[in-house]
Swiss-Prot record:
It holds the Pfam family UbiA. Its main location: membrane. It comes from Shewanella baltica (strain OS155 / ATCC BAA-1091). This is 4-hydroxybenzoate octaprenyltransferase. Gene3D superfamilies: UbiA prenyltransferase. GO terms for biological process: ubiquinone biosynthetic process.
Length: 286
């Protein structure tokens, strides 16, 4: 395999070619750093967390594809993934996972002891998540914990502690993650039923849109609580209102439960997260 071909395989394995997951991880992480710092976070901490988010998202994709390698070939959206298609060996994928994981851990060692301890838990959660799809109908709820774990880590890095304010943001992001990843699971629902992969899209059944809406409302309430506990003002409120607008649009997209619109609704959450981040940043700057 030549270098260009290997890069193509690695970029698809780690989803470098599809940054949506990285962005969905990044917005709440940056919000946590800003809230913890009361504005602009420490530059060293900021750089470490941005790089760490990119690396850990890649790690999560690798271990997810490793866990699903025997099933992905039966799912329309995933059958061309490198492990499922045999373009890369499981050994090579696991070696890359270890290298990236150690790189992320090396970055964390530049921070305080509490962050290091939390990072160990985060790595364990990342490894466990893909296998929850085999044993529970609620893997999205476990994913919500994994994808929110950078929030207490960000507070710990910036302040040396994890106050109640952090857990409001954690709860908001957990609810939001369950909502948008259920939209994502709606895309694969028919294939997942055939191969035995479990998801909240299957669990919620005909009430999927309504329950997603409840999680969106819960996320909204917790985002408001996080802002209130940090004394945020009008511009953050405008970010919240924009988030509501995007959430409403997503409900319209998933109304008929068709694959393409459901995937579009999932992707639209990037803009919802960006709106919250920009609103919070503007509230501190202006």
């Amino acid at each position: 395999m030549n270098l260009k071909r290997k890069w193509d395989v690695y970029s698809r394995l780690t989803r470098i070619d599809r940054p949506i997951g990285t962005l969905l991880l990044l917005w709440p992480c940056l919000m946590a750093l800003m809230l913890a710092a009361g504005g602009m976070p420490d530059l060293k901490v900021l750089v470490i967390f941005i790089i760490g988010v990119v690396i850990m998202r890649a790690c999560g994709c690798i271990i997810n594809d490793y866990a699903d390698r025997d099933l992905d070939s039966f799912v329309e959206r995933t059958r061309s993934r490198p492990l499922a298609s045999g373009e890369i060996s499981t050994k090579e994928a696991l070696i890359l996972f270890v290298i990236l994981g150690l790189s992320a851990f090396g970055l964390v060692l530049l921070l305080n002891g509490l962050v290091v301890k939390l990072s160990v838990v985060g790595i364990i959660l990342t490894i466990i998540y893909p296998f929850t799809k085999r044993i529970t109908n609620m893997p999205q709820m476990f994913l919500g914990i994994v994808w929110s774990w950078s929030i207490p880590m960000a507070y710990a890095a910036q302040t040396g502690e994890v106050p109640m304010e952090a857990w409001w943001l954690f709860a908001a992001n957990w609810c939001w993650t369950v909502a948008y990843d259920t939209m994502y699971a709606m895309v694969d629902r028919d294939d997942d039923l055939k191969v035995g992969i479990k998801s909240t899209a299957i669990l919620f059944g005909k009430y999927d849109r309504q329950i997603i809406g409840l999680f969106q409302l819960a996320a909204l309430a917790c985002f408001i609580a996080a802002g209130w506990s940090a004394d945020r003002g009008l511009l953050y409120g405008l970010g919240i209102l924009t988030f509501v607008g995007f959430s409403t649009y997503q409900q319209m997209l998933i109304f008929d439960r068709e694959r393409a619109p459901c995937f579009k609704a999932f992707l639209n959450n990037n803009w919802a997260g960006l709106a919250l981040f920009v609103g919070l940043g503007a509230d501190y700057l202006i």
